[in-house]
Amino acid sequence: MARSHKVTKPKRQQVDTSGSYNALMVLMGDNVKKAEKRVEEEEPVEQELEEDDIEGAGEEEEEVDEEQEEEEDADDAEEDAEDDSETDKYDPYKLHFEAEEAKYVSVIKSEEWKTSSEKTKIGSQPVRITYTNLEDADELLDFSEAQKTEFSKYTVRPRIKDGFKQLNGSLTSVQKAIYPSLMAYRDLCYATSSLSDTEEFSRLVAMHIAQHVVRTAEEVAYNTRILKRNAEEGIHDVEFRDQGYTKPRVLVLVPTKNACFEFMQLLVGASGVDREDNKARFNKAFHEAGAVLDTKPEDFQKAFKGNTDDMFCLGVKLRNKSIRYYSYFYQADIVFASPLGLKTLVGSEGDSKREFDFLSSIEIAYLHETNHMEMQSWDNVLTVLGQTNLLPNESHGCDFSRVKSFYLDGLAKHFRQTIVACQFVTPTINSVFSNTVNFAGKTKITPIYNGELAVAGMKIRQIFTRFKALSVSDEIDARFKAFVQITLEGMIRSGDYSGTLIYVPTYVELVRLRNYMDEKNISFGAISEYSSITEVKRHRTLFRDGREKILLYTGRLHHYRRYFVKGVKSVVIYKLPENPAFYRELLLFLTHSVDEGTLEQSMAKCRALFTIYDLLALERIVGTKRVKTMAKSGESSYEFY
């Protein structure tokens, strides 16, 4: 029977208006009341979403010959065991998941973390690699051994090894740098703006997931065969701890159906399967031909091509020779889901009906295209991760005599590997990654940035002004006060502010500025991710023609539409964009006006406010070297050309 969940969803594109601390703005009573005066933007409306609305949910339990499946898996396990028995094979799976209980409990309870970092190059890209380890974990895992072991010496199932070689070819420089951390089950955050590097990373992750799932299934089947033989021979003193509470071992979070489809193709290729069950149904629901206009930036084309539906939750069963889409969740090995789809299924605190037991035994959680999911709703991601590795409410046929000890000890989250793939690391991504507690440790790889100051192709005056904020919570009001006093009031007094584009990251920040400017009777327009297409066109035209002197423009609208705004003579940045490409594109608005002859180059100017809490975004814009100086210096303003 379909279950319904009440969620808040805008009429057009769902965006997060509550996920960040900036959402506190909307709780200011006077501002909320005045926001109601304007009806240009389409406010969020409540819609009833049912389980049947989620692609892939509601699948019934399948009638399968489990004994036949187990026999096939056990046969495969015996064949693969011969390959595993080679004395020079390195097996991080065994080191991680079969660690001695007394030792891993001691290491985990110590909670003594140490961090080290190094600067190196991956290919031609300078990077910083940060390693975080538990003090005594090396006695169990010896990560240094993983780092010096050749990829060919790792234990990988022959079919997967062959499939990955056919899909990928020889390891690339990116993959060589990453595989020791990935295959040693360390938490891993990899940030790169290179689409080719992202693809190489994704192929390696697909292989790792396939290896983990097939290895786990074969181990369970092989041990079941042994137990049956022992029972026939009257032997009952042998036990195997090889299972979780429920069957799914891997969670893959992706922003859209197209992203799911593309990663699934990598998984199929890397696993080397011969058969795809329900392939036609999957292709029809997830694949959509057609590309985004090639006039849009490359990263936009990647994010929004194909099927952009963000409401799905799909169970996938993977075996050595076959893959089955639309598997019943409690019979699936992998759960592919959008944050919105899975959050709707999981429910929220206080809901009468919630379903998250199938997330209780996740051993790998992979966040794919994470920055895109941030723009959708980070709250959904946090909710889903928060419901992972909890004790299930029902047994679901679990054989508790075979549940791994770390599940019974309540330590599942300490064994789960979290993998994050992103273009750039934001404070929200940092927060999630910093709070993972995998006892194998974690590795974070981030670029060393040159910055975006000179990308515009001509010299543009760029001014960065620091303001003080005592804390993250104080930053909200401190930023608004600084913006009004330092930027807005001076601009209005001068009387020369026609053609000013004010960039704000989100709708809630736009609301506060909009209400203030309403009170001061300032001529302006405002467009956001909630604006109708008609309103966007109208305000862009009025701004271009000078009939609205100021245009408030949100980063989320830019993310979803990537408009090229004309008539810009000055750019004012309320809060730095996390995506450095946005900053570059804001500068291009100015250079276009110069090229059009409507703006003197000497008059083109971009002004931005920043605080110590903006240093990650600032680093990507001014460069790694400059941001260190700006962070330590006592100066309040910095100017670049």
Curated annotation (Swiss-Prot):
GO cellular component: nucleolus; small-subunit processome
Biased composition range(s): Basic residues: 1-12
Disordered: annotated span: 1-22, 34-93
Metal-binding among keywords: no
This protein's UniProt keywords: Nucleus, Ribonucleoprotein, Ribosome biogenesis, rRNA processing
Record flagged with keyword rRNA processing: yes
Places the protein is found: Nucleus, Nucleolus
Major site of localization recorded for this protein: nucleus
UniProt biased composition (Acidic residues): 41-86
Biological process per Gene Ontology, one example term: maturation of SSU-rRNA from tricistronic rRNA transcript (SSU-rRNA, 5.8S rRNA, LSU-rRNA)
GO molecular function, one term: U3 snoRNA binding
Domain of life: Eukaryota
InterPro entries with a match to the protein in the record: UTP25, UTP25_C, UTP25_NTPase-like
Residues spanning the signal sequence: none
Pfam families for this protein: Utp25_C, UTP25_NTPase-like
Function: DEAD-box RNA helicase-like protein required for pre-18S rRNA processing, specifically at sites A0, A1, and A2.
Subunit (UniProt): Component of the ribosomal small subunit (SSU) processome composed of at least 40 protein subunits and snoRNA U3.
PANTHER family: ORF PROTEIN-RELATED, U3 SMALL NUCLEOLAR RNA-ASSOCIATED PROTEIN 25 HOMOLOG
Family membership noted in the UniProt record: Belongs to the UTP25 family.
Protein name per its UniProtKB record: U3 small nucleolar RNA-associated protein 25
Organism: Yarrowia lipolytica (strain CLIB 122 / E 150) (Yeast)
Taxonomic path: Eukaryota, Fungi, Dikarya, Ascomycota, Saccharomycotina
Gene: UTP25
